[in-house]
Amino acid sequence: MAEERHHTEHIPQWKKDEIENIKELIQSHKVFGMVGIEGILATKMQKIRRDLKDVAVLKVSRNTLTERALNQLGETIPGMKEYLDKQTALIFTNESPFKLYKLLEQTKTPSPIRGGAIAPADITVQKGPTSFPPGPILGELQSAGIPASIDAGKVAVKETKVVCKAGEVVPQKLATMLSKLEIYPLIVGLDLRAAYDDGTIYEPELLAVDESKYFSDIIRAAQNAFNLSVNTAFPTSATISTLLAKASSEAKNLGVNAVILEPGVMDTLLAKAHVQMTSVASEAADKDANAVDDDLREVLGAAASAAAAAAAAAPAEEEVKKEEEPEEEEEDHAEEDGMAGLGALFG
């Protein structure tokens, strides 16, 4: 203990200030994360700082100073030291870890690879024309292992080819040609290793949420719950109106089919009886014109006229429907816009 205190007393003041600053940032923000910054140029780092300045604080410090700050905080931030490795930056925010992960993923952009670097994945050059006219570039591509030729007055890649496999060292010639072809094998940006929030450490695998699938699952679950509530007659604030409408409809159908003389079904029963009566009368009149009296014959005539008028009006209604179709499309777009608005709630 005395040895540790003696060592601490000989730490330069600027290091002590840096340690205190790290501790203060951890304690004053809801979420604290560690990010990898390997391969990020200074200019890109400055742009990332500007882009994040309204939602997060990005700090680059020595790993030894960060470790000392975490040691001094003790059990306040347990488990985060194991993510402190190589080139590391600290990030502090009051947003959720999920929102932080999404923001950091947006900082990643394709970047050219340098000669001598290790290919992170298979590097493939696709078959097709390039923007280069015939010239020395043809020989340079071929010497880099890219199958090139002249086609229609332009340099073209003759076939799709994997020019460097994952894990292999990228030759300098190939790196130069890839940049000229605007093939950027690297994805460079802040790489979140872990985020700490209220005693829980979140790793990227947990934070990488497919928002569209998650949103669809929520909608499907809500629909299934609604259907279950209606089909099992389980009343809730969301389904009570549907259940009452369903019960009313079923009660009315029962009253009509069982011929129960109640005020709510009398009109339907009378209308049904009238239709049945006119149907029987029509068949009787077809067989014998004298089978129906004048009053009934007049009713049958009115029904026939109404049927003819309805048949004549059908084409006109079809034309009106065609004219209304654009409006329906506009309504569909409005519904889609509404769904897009809901999607915005997920960040």
From Swiss-Prot:
One biological process term in Gene Ontology: cytoplasmic translation
Residue numbers spanned by region Disordered: 312-347
Domain of life: Archaea
PANTHER family referenced in this protein's UniProt entry, alphabetically: 60S ACIDIC RIBOSOMAL PROTEIN P0, LARGE RIBOSOMAL SUBUNIT PROTEIN UL10
Subunit structure comment from the entry: Part of the 50S ribosomal subunit. Forms part of the ribosomal stalk which helps the ribosome interact with GTP-bound translation factors. Forms a heptameric L10(L12)2(L12)2(L12)2 complex, where L10 forms an elongated spine to which the L12 dimers bind in a sequential fashion.
GO cellular component, one term: cytosolic large ribosomal subunit
Annotated family: Belongs to the universal ribosomal protein uL10 family.
The keyword Secreted belongs to this UniProt entry's keyword annotation: no
Biased composition (Acidic residues): 325-338
Source organism phylogeny: Archaea, Methanobacteriati, Methanobacteriota, Stenosarchaea group, Methanomicrobia
Alphabetically ordered keywords of this record: Ribonucleoprotein, Ribosomal protein, RNA-binding, rRNA-binding
Protein name: Large ribosomal subunit protein uL10
Protein task: Forms part of the ribosomal stalk, playing a central role in the interaction of the ribosome with GTP-bound translation factors.
GO molecular function terms attached to this record: large ribosomal subunit rRNA binding; structural constituent of ribosome
Source species of the chain: Methanosarcina acetivorans (strain ATCC 35395 / DSM 2834 / JCM 12185 / C2A)
